[in-house]
Amino acid sequence: MTESVLDYMTRLGRAARQASRVIARATTAQKNRALLAAADALDAARPELTAANEQDLANGRANGLEPALLDRLALTPARIDEMIEGLRQVAKLPDPIGEIRDMRYLPSGIQVGKMRVPLGVIGIIYESRPNVTIDAASLCLKSGNATILRGGSEAIHSNRAIATCIQQGLAAADLPPHVVQVVETTDRAAVGALITMPEFVDVIVPRGGKSLIERVSRDAKVPVIKHLDGVCHVYIDVAADLDKAIRIADNAKTQRYAPCNTMETLLVHSAIAERVLPPLAAIYRDKGVELRGCAQTRALLGAGVLEATEEDWRTEYTAPILSIRVLDNLEQAIEHINTYGSHHTDSIVTENFSDARRFLNEVDSSSVMVNASTRFADGFEYGLGAEIGISTDKLHARGPVGLEGLTSEKYVVFGDGHVRT
């Protein structure tokens, strides 16, 4: 009799729960040995990885997959190099598990502190990019968590080949293979099962399109670490340095269009708009960026700027399109960001300390910046070493989620025969 999807996922969940108890007590040396051995296994398996990936690419082309998605799916030699180096870099990161902080003596005589511990079992759901398999597996392993990885069906052969290398790394460190498991069925029912197993899964991390994340957020019976959109802003204040403003607004939009930390709306103080918008518009037009603006923007820049609609202010384009709005003061800029933004990343360009502090205090986003491009909102750029994603939620992890974001804390108490009176 064929095993049902629910039975299969339950089997994976049960095995992950058992493995989570083993990896939680693994030593730092043991975890690092697994990561380095997995890196060596990937290096040795380049022909197998390439063959598996070619099978996925052929299937993708046959199924009419868009060129951009085919590019994300491809495991080029350079991307395999990056995966190998990624494993080695995670092995070098400090191990957060077991760290005790804030120890203090209380009047009762007991000593109380907090110890950092793994979350347990992490389910990760993602699309297209097989390199996410390595990113997710390595961070979960180093943080002492077991993980169940459900990649996109278009990358199934690549993910299986990568998983084989990870299993070899686990075996080399005498760790159970179920510490990292890849879902090998392409049946979409596997996602529904994974997000509704609170007895086996402690948290879900979805990485992909908005529809996937909305579905997971709506249907999950376990906590979810996620962000829906990346509607990021740069506000050019009246006290901005013009050279800095132009450089930042250019980079935030045009360095790359697809990432979630790319600027989608540019806000400009009316007193500086006439000096900063024309040179910026020339840069954007040279780079093929379509401009959509408010009435003041269109009056200033003339023909070629489309009228921005209410929907534009809320849209993550992930394309060479930019909305521009001219405002009269900082208060209006903050109000616009908190109304239309996605609580991801927003930046102010200003030389006024009070304006900068007010922006930092009042903008309700996971990353708030002063005189820096929104493109810096990234775990690597923040010195986290790597990230599993970015969270715009307010509970547990917020912003780029690195090793520490995949852990929790428990109180530890030391006494010497103390009893409560």
Swiss-Prot record:
Pathway(s) this gene product operates in, as recorded in its UniProt entry: Amino-acid biosynthesis; L-proline biosynthesis; L-glutamate 5-semialdehyde from L-glutamate: step 2/2
SUPFAM superfamilies: ALDH-like
Gene Ontology annotations of biological process type: L-proline biosynthetic process
Pfam family, one: Aldedh
Cytoplasm found in the keyword field: yes
Recorded catalytic activity of this chain's protein: L-glutamate 5-semialdehyde + phosphate + NADP(+) = L-glutamyl 5-phosphate + NADPH + H(+)
Chief location category: cytoplasm
InterPro entries from the UniProt entry: Ald_DH/histidinol_DH, Ald_DH_C, Ald_DH_N, Aldehyde_DH_dom, Glu-5-SA_DH, GPR_dom
One function term, GO molecular function aspect: NADP binding
EC number: 1.2.1.41
Recorded coiled-coil stretches: none
CDD domains the record matches: ALDH_F18-19_ProA-GPR
Keywords: Amino-acid biosynthesis, Cytoplasm, NADP, Oxidoreductase, Proline biosynthesis
One annotated Gene Ontology cellular component of this protein: cytoplasm
Record's function text: Catalyzes the NADPH-dependent reduction of L-glutamate 5-phosphate into L-glutamate 5-semialdehyde and phosphate. The product spontaneously undergoes cyclization to form 1-pyrroline-5-carboxylate.
PANTHER family linked to this entry: DELTA-1-PYRROLINE-5-CARBOXYLATE SYNTHASE, GLUTAMATE SEMIALDEHYDE DEHYDROGENASE
Protein name: Gamma-glutamyl phosphate reductase
Native species: Pseudomonas fluorescens (strain ATCC BAA-477 / NRRL B-23932 / Pf-5)
Organism classification: Bacteria, Pseudomonadati, Pseudomonadota, Gammaproteobacteria, Pseudomonadales
Gene name linked to the record: proA
